[in-house]
């Protein structure tokens, strides 16, 4: 009997494991749904029938709707939504339930005026727009966490629940310059520096007679677009970032306490220009079990920059997480027919598991009422509904092979302080990062965006593109990476300033000059130096020579490099004389390469191709230009022809199209803007 019980228990464990495994091998297609716009239960039932007919598996609900659940202080109204959740469960549609802690309700702004935004000129702003709350305000946080507690307790065990959404677009919204915010900033500075002397030293306040004698003399820096006081601005942006992260962690802790088995997800637009913050703190914590973004690739079918930009967004939100990624918002609007489908297949190659269209119903009111959804304003499905239905039908055929697990051998370094510091340079850090990412997009190769201080750096090749702020921890990890056999490529604007934002007074690249075997002098402005160009170049144009091959590029500036043991790999050859611009230095078991120009594909491409061979980095699938491709596992390949011409795929083996249920005996052709998923026989 005892043995029989053990067998039964073991069987249950195995079934649970297999169920979890099958759940992971799944793709979700669905929509963002706003039942609070019309609580008519018959309309909701009709919508759900249409969702079922389309093969939808998921809806995202609740975002931006705090006062639909708490219309006045402490008065919760979940009854209407309980019925919606029950209907979703009956239809076997899973729910991502956003905890809508922003925007805060008007009643909360009225009760606590301190939570309203104060602009940099001291004007208190009425919350006419969304995200108009000071998220660091203790009164705001008290009520946001109370709302989180109520909602998660109420729905933690609902069978329709797939995940709780943690805020929405946390990097968007205004920064508040209120007195309460200033006092919190002062407290943050006290905790960091402990003394006024340390603060004055870090901020170089002797410059322009700005010495601080007591804490209360501290004011805010100018608006975020100002170039004044870079040291102070860097600390202020760290403070803003810390407040956002602290709130997100508090919300996550409440969710995990009340609903320990629930997945967590956010639409992480951390790189909004308004409140750009350091999302790596969340990403590396592991507490956000499903990273996410809004995949808005634009309306075009024939251009691909939108797909590239949004796929890059996945990479810089996911960092090194191996969990599936969720695109919890996805284009509808006026996207050209088949462009949504193109984007959906492209997203699979970056680990995406979910295509959740924004939005289901074209909304009847508000600022977004002209953003067309899958249903027109009268509830009649339009062509976007049909396209999402097609995506759901096709994804069902291939889902057991997904989500794709990236196999990256290359890391691309991101640094939040460097993004803030780089506003003083012609090329911002994130633009250099994307230029490096683009290199691998064109080669159909996996990469990971990494935060060096948090990463184990288990890569063969590491790019450090314009990482301006160099601290002891980061420099030590780069040094160890190279010493132990790694190859690093660092581009201009890197290791310029220390962690306070002050330019290194020692030899640059700061803390790493010996590693690279160079001394960086000053920079030159290309446009003025072209007055003496041997080739009569004008503007920002430069000729770069790599291994005897002349390549045209452009750059606002270029570095003056003195060799201190490094060898020259490339030169600028169009100016008054040759200037060494790409160098290589052996260090330990590895190699450190410096490029005195911002990251550009034409400058780095040939070097990368050489390093792929030299370091035995696995190449992407061999496909014609204009085809995205990934080898999903040992005998399955995903393709997306993103061009307007048919593309022939070279194939020696026999294969079968799982998408279109046909056999190939060798090479096969993919039609323009069409996907293909094949199994090698």
Put a short name on every predicted segment:
Residues 9-19:
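Bacterial N-terminal signal peptides
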Residues 25-29, 55-57, 89-95, 157-162, ...:
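Short, well-ordered coil/turn segments that N-cap beta-strands
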Residues 29-40, 64-79, 126-145, 170-174, ...:
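The substrate-binding groove and active-site-proximal loops of carbohydrate-active enzymes
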Residues 31, 51, 59, 88, ...:
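Conserved, mostly hydrophobic/aromatic
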Residues 38-53, 144-150, 274-284, 310, ...:
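Short, acidic/polar
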Residues 45-54, 58-124, 152, 251-258, ...:
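Aromatic-lined substrate-binding rim segments of carbohydrate-active enzymes
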Residues 125-290, 294-309:
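Polysaccharide-binding and catalytic clefts of secreted carbohydrate-active enzymes
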Residues 299-681:
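Carbohydrate-binding surfaces of carbohydrate-active enzymes
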